[in-house]
Amino acid sequence: MAVEIEQFMCRSDNFGVLVHDPKSGQTAIIDAPEEAPILAAIKRTGWTPTMILTTHHHMDHVEANLALKERFKLRIVGPEAEKAKIPGIDETVEEGSVLHLGDERIEVIATPGHTAGHVSYHLPASKVAFTADTLFALGCGRLFECKPPVMYESLRKLAALPAATTIYCGHEYTLANARFALTVDPTNSALKERATRIEALRVDNKPTLPTTIGEELSTNPFLRWHDPAIRKHLGMEKAGDAEVFAEIRKRKDNF
């Protein structure tokens, strides 16, 4: 039986997520951006959280850790490399670590780039992954603590997940990402169609997430370093994949 997922907005543009295993009754919170919206989601669903799965140390992902831990006596899991920066952490994980939500297997993927210790959580049986600020819909996270080749390798890992994998990200950045994507991949018809859909969703204040690996592979320039049209547009036909990624990231930083 697949997990049930409740996605909701926190702060100005963060996504909060609850992941519930109906068989065991266990519930995980993916990051804790803000207490009040998380409590509202818990009340709305009737699910009692048993753990927080932290992806990285930035305050807009851990702010409610201690308040939720005190209220629900839950355990907080997070990356070993950032344990000193994550409030209330009880258990650390790294590449290859395995957790369980009831019988649901959670595989930890090290995805540094945005921060040096960032991790993503993959639930293969439910075909879902939580990538926070590594992979966004039509984008990737800004590189605060790592160089472009590090993020490139992290995105390669995520791109290798099955195309049908549903992806939940950390922020509602998709509209701005779409506008940038069109500047580096202007002839991509799938991207143009997706950008139109995104514009309509945001006019109605509707979320653009979740997405899928397959959709990102066809439209997200940060996963399309190999594409001949993008390479030609950038004048980088003979460059290495990591170089193309770095140029796209540089352009996004200045967009």
Curated annotation (Swiss-Prot):
It catalyses: an S-(2-hydroxyacyl)glutathione + H2O = a 2-hydroxy carboxylate + glutathione + H(+). Pathway: Secondary metabolite metabolism; methylglyoxal degradation; (R)-lactate from methylglyoxal: step 2/2. InterPro entries: Clx_II_MBL, Glyoxalase_II_hydrolase, HAGH_C, Hydroxyacylglutathione_Hdrlase, Metallo-B-lactamas, RibonucZ/Hydroxyglut_hydro. Its cofactor is Zn(2+). Zn(2+) 1 binds at H56, H58, H114, D133. CDD domains: hydroxyacylglutathione_hydrolase_MBL-fold. Binds 2 Zn(2+) ions per subunit. Its EC number is 3.1.2.6. Zn(2+) 2 binds at D60, H61, D133, H171. SMART domains: Lactamase_B (SM00849). It holds the Pfam family HAGH_C. GO terms for biological process: methylglyoxal catabolic process to D-lactate via S-lactoyl-glutathione. Keywords: Hydrolase, Metal-binding, Zinc. The keyword Zinc applies. GO terms for molecular function: hydroxyacylglutathione hydrolase activity; metal ion binding. Belongs to the metallo-beta-lactamase superfamily. Glyoxalase II family. Monomer. Thiolesterase that catalyzes the hydrolysis of S-D-lactoyl-glutathione to form glutathione and D-lactic acid. This is Hydroxyacylglutathione hydrolase.
